[in-house]
Amino acid sequence: MSAVAAMSWWQVISLAVVQGLTEFLPVSSSGHLAVVSRVFFSDDAGASFTAVTQLGTEAAVLVYFARDIVRILRAWFDGLVVTSHRNADYRLGWYVIIGTIPICVMGLLFKDEIRSGVRNLWVVATALVVFSGVIALAEYLGRQSRHVEQLTWRDGLVVGVAQTLALVPGVSRSGSTISAGLFLGLDRELAARFGFLLAIPAVFASGLFSLPDAFHPVTEGMSATGPQLLVATLIAFVVGLAAVSWFLRFLLRHSMYWFVGYRVVVGVVVLILLATGTVAAT
């Protein structure tokens, strides 16, 4: 691998589209960025590029869930002042806060490993295959009988802990949170919506934390300029908005078994490419 390679506009646009398409699907956006970067461009875009472009996809979540977010915030602040107004939305606000704590703690503790070692393609491919089994098991065992009024702080904590698994590229943030929700008996749409709401503070914090690093000179991998990062973030926003809308409609009628099969195929193909020396792991 070369020391530093400047990213072309074609690479920037391609990876931004990949980020937007895969951020909300249970297939791992960070894993796909690592795979696409190395298989097609022979180098890694890096964790900072991933984190900054995630700001675009998370902005898409803000737009898509704007009414829900405003309603929850109003209920939360209202409930702090008037105890008799503490409804399901007030409690949901607390569950998001509780669920955000685990990934913030783990992200700070293992930030160096996240930026380097775990982006190894052996890790990514293995996680794609292994965690597909977890998703399949969640679909098989999930009762899907609980609704938003039945959420508890324990649900927020469990889904929040599950979200920390997404720090490993190849696992998938939506895959881990939706699976946790299904194991807890939540219906599929609620598990997805709660997982997306839970991701907002964590991903924005990660993106803002990595923003200064993205503009500093790098010593290895691919390097994007400021204008390239801006364009990539905007593309990720547009594509991500379309993706989250499609995915939530998809979950109303379909299970995640489709994505289980996809993950296994991609993971096995990458493992074969690694085993034959066609692609470098780092």
Swiss-Prot record:
Q: Which UniProt keywords apply?
A: Antibiotic resistance, Cell membrane, Cell shape, Cell wall biogenesis/degradation, Hydrolase, Membrane, Peptidoglycan synthesis, Transmembrane, Transmembrane helix
How the protein sits in the membrane? Multi-pass membrane protein
Gene Ontology biological-process annotations: cell wall organization; peptidoglycan biosynthetic process; regulation of cell shape; response to antibiotic
Q: What is the lineage of its organism?
A: Bacteria, Bacillati, Actinomycetota, Actinomycetes, Mycobacteriales
| Signal sequence residues | none
Against NCBIfam families, the record matches this protein to: PRK00281.2-1 (NF001392), undec_PP_bacA (TIGR00753)
Which residue ranges does UniProt annotate as crossing the membrane? 90-110, 121-141, 165-185, 194-214, 228-248, 256-276
* Enzyme Commission number(s): 3.6.1.27
* Top-rank taxon: Bacteria
| UniProt protein name | Undecaprenyl-diphosphatase
An example of a Gene Ontology cellular component annotation for this protein is:
plasma membrane
* Organism per entry: Mycobacterium marinum (strain ATCC BAA-535 / M)
